[in-house]
């Protein structure tokens, strides 16, 4: 017997028992974003490798350790996308969407990072991202945060997430802070772990979000980024906080929040949950006003966020918030000569007359008992029964599978009877 082939580690199937909750989450996400007037964009899964090294940063963990990179037959270095913002910016520049234009875009799809698989963190994962180009005020930052807050309410998880905010200022402000932070950290090299020592001179702001308790202890007296912010960044952040206060959105200012990608400036934010253990960030984003120019476009302000769908689904499962619509509403049961085609025709008629009604037809024969058992297994609410007598009389038996009651009705009337299920 041939050896069975397994899925790649960290890349998971979404099985029929799991997909309804995924569809619910995806549907809510799309509906909320669409309510704000944003438009969908779809980008390739594979991009040129240098897009990510230029956008994300050469010395970030993503570029150094986590990307799936390969050389194609033409000798070009290609990478499975580890995130969506860089590709969205590339698409906007290439297709002339960004120059002197305002764009509000969203996308959804798989991303890839070669990380150690664990609960809430996988090598293939799915993100929804929202990006706004051409607007530089704190008002659009606030709208994106308000959008995410609405999404949590729609998903029923608003009481289990909290918002953390920070401003990391301009490139110049961060450069000044970077120098001060390195000077401070050099005094504690005996405390820093190898990861932090490596980051200290290449990307010292990442030391701030180290999970090492010894490192966190010495950061208590480290220079504060807020002391190095430029006046415009301070004003922008104050405006954002004022708008969030007016909207009634609670938040905490976390001065160690820097995000893991190099392109951010000014506003950064994360939504955190305690429901997922160590993988507590369900959504993160911020401003990246320099990225469009960095990738070859004209200077264009931009802000956005991304959320991990696996973590949202996992969070809803953890909280028991798993009510989803059944995948089958009506199960068509037939028995007797000539009844199969009549059943298929009636099922098709119902699909046309009641948009959204989910009708499954039984195939493979078997007596009524076997067919009703199958109807129960797929979770149908109603069984429609067609025998030879019903076909001749143009009627159908409508059976409630939960209560057991059944009635015979004219086939012409059954659509009205089932409309409430759609």
UniProtKB/Swiss-Prot annotation:
One of its GO terms (cellular component) is cytoplasm. GO terms for biological process: histidyl-tRNA aminoacylation. It is found in: Cytoplasm. It catalyses: tRNA(His) + L-histidine + ATP = L-histidyl-tRNA(His) + AMP + diphosphate + H(+). SUPFAM superfamilies: Class II aaRS ABD-related (SSF52954), Class II aaRS and biotin synthetases (SSF55681). Its main location: cytoplasm. It comes from the Bacteria. Keywords: Aminoacyl-tRNA synthetase, ATP-binding, Cytoplasm, Ligase, Nucleotide-binding, Protein biosynthesis. It holds the Pfam family tRNA-synt_His. Its EC number is 6.1.1.21. One of its GO terms (molecular function) is ATP binding. CDD domains: HisRS-like_core, HisRS_anticodon. Belongs to the class-II aminoacyl-tRNA synthetase family. Homodimer. NCBIfam families: hisS. This is Histidine--tRNA ligase. It comes from Vibrio cholerae serotype O1 (strain ATCC 39315 / El Tor Inaba N16961).
